[in-house]
Amino acid sequence: MLYLVLFLVPFNSIQITIYDQENFQGKRMEFTSSCPNVSERNFDNVRSLKVECGAWIGYEHTSFCGQQFILERGEYPRWDAWSGSNAYHIERLMSFRPICSANHKESKITIFEKENFIGRQWEICDDYPSLQAMGWFNNEVGSMKIQCGAWVCYQYPGYRGYQYILECDHHGGDYKHWPEWGSHAQTSQIQSIRRIQQ
């Protein structure tokens, strides 16, 4: 009698494939964890990529510094695919890491008028292409508390401009001042916000 035994390999929840040329050409490498410097993996930079599983943050510079770009499941054949309608021309990524706290269904964030969680506040559990159109009184946010999940905040309405990725498991979910949003943060201007897809 012959018995067939199947061994199920756990499905990896995060995976990204990077390429050193546009349109998925050239050298390629797969990752299932953070990469603080693609140069240490014999890449000059990342020019295209595919996110197979999970959500990731790509950075303009090494050591997770510089402009941030949200990388959700899908293909990014060129720089303009990850920068979207961003007016800032960044043709490469030098480091990236997975977002472990993305939980689209249960995401919750509270935005505050001023730094240190002072002033008017608004609890958000949904995507808003324009905070002002939905009732927020100005184009700036002083501080934010991430109760659950991960969010991407944009400088302008319609998910445009600088991207700031905020997670409940970084800074304890507390972002007291706009410089904590990322090393590239230059202003407290936030006009659209959305949950990160896992």
From Swiss-Prot:
Modified residues (S-methylcysteine): C65, C100
Domain annotation Beta/gamma crystallin 'Greek key': ranges: 14-53, 54-100, 107-148, 149-197
GO MF annotations in UniProt: identical protein binding; structural constituent of eye lens
Region (Connecting peptide): 101-106
Presence of keyword Ion transport: no
Keyword set includes Nucleus: no
Ranges where the record places region N-terminal arm: 1-13
Biological process terms in GO annotation: camera-type eye development
InterPro entries: Beta/Gamma-Crystallin, Beta/gamma_crystallin, G_crystallin-like
Annotated family: Belongs to the beta/gamma-crystallin family.
Record's protein name: Beta-crystallin A1
Species of origin: Mus musculus
Lineage of the organism: Eukaryota, Metazoa, Chordata, Craniata, Vertebrata
